[in-house]
Structure formats: C-alpha cells, structure tokens
Design a protein with these regions (language model features):
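Conserved, mostly hydrophobic/aromatic
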Residues: 23, 49, 91, 100, ...
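Short, acidic/polar
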Residues: 36-49, 159-169
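Non-globular sequence segments
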Residues: 103-170, 174
Length: 232
C-alpha cells in the first residue's frame, strides 16, 4: 500500500516502538503449579515474538487470591519476579518491548486455587454460572464450574488495590516497559462495573460512579506506584 506505515516507529508515551504491531495478551497457562512461576517455555514463547513493536503478556495475577486458572502466572512473589526478569531480558535483547497485563479474576475462580480454600471474591454473591480451568492428577487441563463467589469486604477491596500497586512495582523491578490493567471480560474490575454482578449498597455499588470506583482506585494506585507513562 502506498501509505502503509505498519512498520514505521510510533511513540507510546515516553517510549518509541520500533513498529506498530502489538501482540495482544493471550492466556497460555504455562506456569508451575502451585507457585505460578512462568516456565522456560513461556520465556521462549515471548522471545519468539519480540520482533513486534510491543508484546503484552498474558493476564498475570497480582496475588494468590487473584488466581482463577491453574497454570496462570503471577507477579507477586520473588520467584515469579525473577522468572519474569529473565523473560523480559530476553525480549529486550532482541530489541523488543514488553508490558505485563495485571488481573484479578474475581468470581472466575475455584475454591481449590484460593488461599485457605475460601470462595472467590466478587462485588456481590451472584453466581453467574461461569467455568474455569484446573488441572487433574495427570496435570492435564480440565474445565470445571467456578465456585459461587462471596462479596468482597471493604478491607479486601483495599487489599486488592494495594496488590495491584505492589504488582506494578514488581513489574518495574522485573524490567517490564509498563503494565496494563485488565478491566474487562468479566473479571473482578468488570464485575464491579456491571449491575448484574454488583448489587452493593456502599461506595462501590449503586451509581455508575460508585461502580467505577474500584477500577479508578486501582489505576490511581498503579500510577502512584510507577507513573502515568507506564500504566495503561
């Protein structure tokens, strides 16, 4: 095409991407259970895609409570940060840039992967009949019904915000070029946005402004933890 600029550089905040091809986040479930540490295979996967202008990692948990899928990675322990740093270094060595997508699955989870075997948190105790992915005794992926959720307490909401902020700091420590906050697709932040799953009557429920509050609080906390140029 006469005016094709796909392979031209583009500015992203304070950073320059070498082209305009962006790899979207795709869940691979290639982490070690139960520590949620990314494997060498995950590192190879991202390294192979470093020729794009920007790699966005698969959704990555901000805490053990944020976990919903067996095999999904985290970025909240030292071992996880160390593993991610090796992956990031390999992408950078090939001239690529990489950001980590941060998530909390909320009700899309199962008690078997939750701390102390508790029910997963959500905005309210609304069971929407979703399924998630676990592993059987042969380490094979299996689909199961999610455990019906419980409403998050205000203290738990504060902890979620703090977990996103700490995960942002951890991403910076691992050398990532930024973080992307996952606020869609029916996961925790989205569950607070939607009236079907948010039936709260406190400052996080009711009006549109209140239902947006958790997402905005999370973004503010992530920006405070790093800066606005590195948070999306």
């Amino acid at each position: 095409m006469a005016h094709d600029n796909l392979f031209e550089t583009v500015e992203m905040g304070t950073q320059t991407l070498k082209n305009r091809i962006i790899m979207a986040p795709l869940t691979r479930l290639r982490s070690v259970e139960p520590s949620d540490v990314p494997t060498a295979l995950a590192g190879e996967y991202y390294s192979q895609r470093a020729s794009s202008g920007l790699v966005i990692t698969e959704a990555t948990q901000v805490s053990f409570q944020a976990k919903g899928y067996a095999g999904a990675p985290g970025v909240h322990t030292k071992d996880q940060i160390t593993a991610w740093k090796a992956i990031v270094d390999n992408v950078h060595a090939k001239g690529g840039k990489i950001v980590v997508q941060l998530w909390h699955t909320g009700l899309v989870s199962h008690e078997s992967v939750q701390p102390d075997g508790k029910a997963p948190i959500s905005a309210s105790n609304v069971d929407v009949g979703v399924r998630t992915s676990l592993r059987d005794s042969d380490n094979q992926a299996i689909r199961v019904d999610a455990t019906p959720p419980r409403p998050a307490t205000l203290d738990e909401i504060k902890q979620v915000i703090a977990d996103f902020a700490q995960a942002t700091k951890n991403a910076q420590e691992a050398g990532f070029d930024g973080v992307e906050v996952h606020g869609a697709h029916g996961y925790l932040l989205h569950q607070f946005w939607v009236e079907q799953t948010n039936q709260r009557d406190d400052e996080y429920g009711g009006s549109r402004e209140n239902r947006a509050r958790l997402t905005l609080d999370v973004i503010d906390a992530c920006v405070d933890a790093w800066d606005a140029d590195h948070v999306g």
